[in-house]
């Protein structure tokens, strides 16, 4: 089964909790605080594995949760950092934020990595909060929650050359003739329902990867006939080989087929219409093929490179392979995907973690309670040990320093009003 798109949920590990502890040793009457920090939570990392070809593994497991860091211990011993969760993906995997569709990473090279969900920082032990005014603090910090994100994985095959055309024009037969690939071949439409790759060697020793893509139909650029899934794999190819049934054996007009497929390539975007293209006039062993080819050449002109072949009888196959190899040599230094990504503002390196901003919003619930939300305040809430009075007082000071108290007053909050943050409720006190 070929799986080229899947949506999964990632949860990075929470940081381990810091601990409140004191140094208690004989002959050391005032040992002071000795609580260690918690360990860092595991991040979720994607890594390219050249041995993989599909996203099949993610079809059966859609949720991945990384481990949390170990808690701190006494004697200022810090908790162990959790081992990162590394998920292997095939070359050509694009990772997007499922909600915003922002491209987080484009993984194309063996061993390339991207941190997509960052593990939480370990909570600080009480020894970290010691000051001259408070030399023995009796509170510590919980670990920071790990990031949680839903992402879409898209696989775009890494092939040098893509075979495109209507169903049953002979693409699979051509691939089977020029490589050792064994695609499914049949006398009916859409025999090929998944992309097939084959390594092709020319008689003069050059080689390239050829992809046989499922047949396109009119409206493919708008998703008709799974067109989006199929056209996605053309994006990374350097050369497009447009296969046409020049005999018209299916009752179609070769010229109309040519125009329709090129229109779909242009409509899809990604500048596919600008890729170097070779037109393969296939099925030249059948009746009417020669006459149709002459009419076709008259209509498209001399600027279109046309190679007449018969994949069935293997006529002119070597000439086609030489033409493809020459075209690849001509465009070997051109990175079409880079140009497309720059036009779209895509970062192809990796996802960079952006720290939370100290912004917040205040809304009202139906029961008139004030609801404070925002990444920074919610992060502080999760990292506060509300079983410790000193920790609660520290949280209140943090709210004041962020300007939340003043903002609540401006919204009309009075003494005794209820304030909610995540699952917690507080009384507003003047």
UniProtKB/Swiss-Prot annotation:
Any GO MF annotation of the entry: GTP binding
EC number, as in UniProt: 3.6.5.-
GO BP field: ribosome biogenesis
Binding site for Mg(2+): 172, 192
Start and end residues of each OBG-type G domain: 159-329
Main EC class the enzyme belongs to: hydrolase
Pfam families for the chain: DUF1967 (PF09269), GTP1_OBG (PF01018), MMR_HSR1 (PF01926)
Keywords, comma-separated and alphabetical: Cytoplasm, GTP-binding, Hydrolase, Magnesium, Metal-binding, Nucleotide-binding
Cysteines joined through disulfide linkages: none
Gene Ontology CC entries for this record: cytoplasm
Positions of the OCT domain: 352-430
Family: Belongs to the TRAFAC class OBG-HflX-like GTPase superfamily. OBG GTPase family.
Subunit structure and binding partners: Monomer.
HAMAP family: GTPase_Obg
Primary role: An essential GTPase which binds GTP, GDP and possibly (p)ppGpp with moderate affinity, with high nucleotide exchange rates and a fairly low GTP hydrolysis rate. Plays a role in control of the cell cycle, stress response, ribosome biogenesis and in those bacteria that undergo differentiation, in morphogenesis control.
UniProt protein name: GTPase Obg
């Amino acid at each position: 089964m070929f799986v080229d798109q899947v949506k999964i949920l990632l949860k990075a590990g929470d940081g381990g909790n810091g601990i409140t502890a004191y140094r208690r040793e004989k002959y050391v009457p005032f040992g002071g605080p000795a609580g260690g920090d918690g360990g860092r939570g595991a991040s979720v990392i994607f890594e390219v594995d050249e041995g993989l070809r599909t996203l099949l593994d993610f079809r059966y497991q859609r949720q991945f949760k990384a481990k949390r860091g170990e808690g701190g211990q006494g004697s200022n011993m810090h908790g162990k950092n959790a081992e990162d969760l590394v998920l292997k993906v095939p070359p050509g995997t694009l990772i997007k934020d499922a909600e915003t569709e922002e491209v987080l990473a484009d993984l194309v090279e063996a061993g390339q990595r991207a941190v997509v969900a960052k593990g939480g920082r370990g909570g600080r032990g009480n020894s970290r909060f010691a000051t001259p005014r408070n030399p023995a603090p009796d509170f510590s910090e919980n670990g920071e929650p790990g990031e949680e994100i839903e992402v879409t994985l898209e696989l775009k095959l890494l092939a040098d050359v893509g075979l495109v055309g209507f169903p049953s024009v002979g693409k699979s037969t051509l691939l089977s003739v020029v490589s050792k690939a064994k695609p499914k071949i049949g006398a009916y439409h859409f025999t090929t329902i998944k992309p097939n790759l084959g390594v092709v060697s020319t008689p003069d020793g050059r080689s390239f990867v050829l992809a046989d893509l499922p047949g396109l139909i009119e409206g493919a650029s708008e998703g008709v006939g799974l067109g989006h899934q199929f056209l996605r794999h053309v994006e990374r190819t350097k050369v497009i080989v447009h296969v046409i049934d020049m005999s018209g054996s299916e009752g179609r007009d070769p010229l109309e087929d040519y125009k329709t497929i090129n229109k779909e390539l242009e409509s899809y975007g990604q500048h596919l219409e600008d890729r170097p293209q070779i037109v393969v006039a296939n099925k030249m062993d059948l009746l009417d093929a020669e006459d149709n080819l002459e009419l076709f050449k008259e209509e498209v002109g001399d600027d279109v490179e046309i190679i007449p072949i018969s994949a069935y009888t293997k006529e002119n196959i070597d000439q086609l392979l030489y033409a493809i190899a020459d075209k690849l040599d001509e465009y070997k230094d051109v990175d079409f995907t880079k140009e497309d990504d720059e036009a779209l503002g895509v970062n192809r390196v990796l996802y960079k973690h952006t720290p939370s901003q100290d912004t917040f919003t205040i809304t009202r619930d139906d029961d008139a309670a004030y609801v404070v939300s925002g990444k920074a305040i919610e992060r502080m809430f999760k990292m506060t040990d509300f079983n410790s009075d000193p920790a609660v007082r520290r949280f209140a000071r943090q709210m004041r320093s962020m300007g939340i108290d003043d903002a609540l007053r401006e919204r009309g909050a009075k003494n005794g009003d209820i304030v909610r943050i995540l699952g917690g409720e507080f009384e507003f006190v003047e």
